[in-house]
Amino acid sequence: MGCTLSAEDKAAVERSKMIDRNLREDGEKAAREVKLLLLGAGESGKSTIVKQMKIIHEAGYSEEECKQYKAVVYSNTIQSIIAIIRAMGRLKIDFGDSARADDARQLFVLAGAAEEGFMTAELAGVIKRLWKDSGVQACFNRSREYQLNDSAAYYLNDLDRIAQPNYIPTQQDVLRTRVKTTGIVETHFTFKDLHFKMFDVGGQRSERKKWIHCFEGVTAIIFCVALSDYDLVLAEDEEMNRMHESMKLFDSTCNNKWFTDTSIILFLNKKDLFEEKIKKSPLTICYPEYAGSNTYEEAAAYIQCQFEDLNKRKDTKEIYTHFTCATDTKNVQFVFDAVTDVIIKNNLKDCGLF
C-alpha cells in the first residue's frame, strides 16, 4: 500500500499549516504592538514626554492647537509670579524698590484677565517691573523653599514676546506648559514599524490607586524622575523630600508582581536644571551620607545607583537608565530611538522570534 494521504489527511495537514501560519502572524503582530506606561511622581516630566511624541512621531502641534495653549501659557506665567510674590512675605524678603508693592497689589487685581487668555499691556508692564526687582530675584533664587513651576523663568524672561497681541505659542512654549494630569491620557503613534500606545497616568498621590491592576502585561514602563527634585519637598506633603518619594514609588513599581516580565526604563529627567542646581545646592540635602563632589557627573551617577540598587531582581531584570531633558526635542528623539531598539529586542525574544 502506498503512502499517499487521503483527502481528509491532506485537509488536516493544510489546517495545521494554516494554524501555524496564523500563530506566527499573531506572534509577529504582537511583537509590533507596544504598550508603554509612563510612571513617576508629580511634575517629573511625563506629560512633556507625551507632547514630544506628538512633535517627533506625528506632525507636532498645528497653529490652531498652539493657539489653544495661549491661556495655559498666561496662566502658568501669572501663577509663577504670584507664587514668588507670596513667598516673599513668608521668607521675609523686601522689594528692592518699595514702589513695587503697588505693582504687586495691581497684579492681584489684573490677574483674572490672563487666566482667561488675555494679557493686557498694563498687566505685562506690572509683571515685567516685578520680575526685574532685586527682591523678587532674590526670592526666585530661593525657590527650593516653596512650590514654583520649572517654566517660571522661561516665560517671565520672554514676556515681551508672549505679551504681544498676536502671540501664538511655539512648540517649545507648549512643551513648557504645566497642567496637572488627572486620569489616564492615551497616545498612539507608529515608529520603526511598531505601533505604540503610550499611557500617561496622573502623578499626584491621590491618582495612584487608579494604576496598577489595569496595566499588567504592558511591554515597558518608562519611569520618570526629576533629578532637580533632590532638594525639594512634595506639593502634596511638605515634609516629604521629592527624591525620596520618587525612590519609594520606583521601588514599588520595579519590584511589583504585575511587572515581573516588563522592561523598566528609567528616565533621570531635568538634567539641565540639575546641572545648574548642583553648583549651589549640595546633594547631601537629600543623601546625607553622600561624600562625593558636587559635580554633575559624580552626583548624577550617585542618584542613578540609588535607584538601580532598589531593583530586587538584578539577576533577571535589567534597568535601562537614560539621562534626559524632556523639553529638548533632539535629546528625547535620541533617547527614544535607543529605548525602541531595546523594546524590539526584548519583544522579539518574548515572541520566540529572536
Curated annotation (Swiss-Prot):
Tree of life domain: Eukaryota
The protein's Enzyme Commission number: 3.6.5.-
One Gene Ontology term from the biological process aspect of the record: regulation of mitotic spindle organization
Region (G2 motif): 173-181
Enzyme class, UniProt record, top EC level: hydrolase
UniProt-annotated binding residues for GTP: 43-48, 150-151, 175-178, 200-204, 269-272, 326
Database matches in InterPro entries: Gprotein_alpha_I, Gprotein_alpha_su, GproteinA_insert, P-loop_NTPase
GO molecular function, one term: GTPase activity
SMART domains documented for this protein: G_alpha
Location within or outside the cell: Nucleus; Cytoplasm; Cell membrane; Cytoplasm, Cytoskeleton, Microtubule organizing center, Centrosome
Lipidation (N-myristoyl glycine): 2
Record-level GO cellular component terms: cell cortex; centrosome; cytoplasm; heterotrimeric G-protein complex; midbody; nucleus; plasma membrane
Keywords, in A-Z order: Cell cycle, Cell division, Cell membrane, Cytoplasm, Cytoskeleton, GTP-binding, Hydrolase, Lipoprotein, Magnesium, Membrane, Metal-binding, Mitosis, Myristate, Nucleotide-binding, Nucleus, Palmitate, Transducer, Transport
Region (G1 motif) residue spans: 35-48
Residue segments, region G5 motif: 324-329
Pfam family, one: G-alpha
Entry similarity comment: Belongs to the G-alpha family. G(i/o/t/z) subfamily.
Subunit and partners: Heterotrimeric G proteins are composed of 3 units; alpha, beta and gamma. The alpha chain contains the guanine nucleotide binding site. Part of a spindle orientation complex at least composed of GNAI1, GPSM2 and NUMA1. Identified in complex with the beta subunit GNB1 and the gamma subunit GNG1. Identified in complex with the beta subunit GNB1 and the gamma subunit GNG2. Component of the TAS2R14-GNAI1 complex, consisting of TAS2R14, GNAI1, GNB1 and GNG2; within the complex interacts with TAS2R14; this complex plays a role in the perception of bitterness.
Protein name, entry field: Guanine nucleotide-binding protein G(i) subunit alpha-1
Species of the source: Pongo abelii (Sumatran orangutan)
Gene field: GNAI1
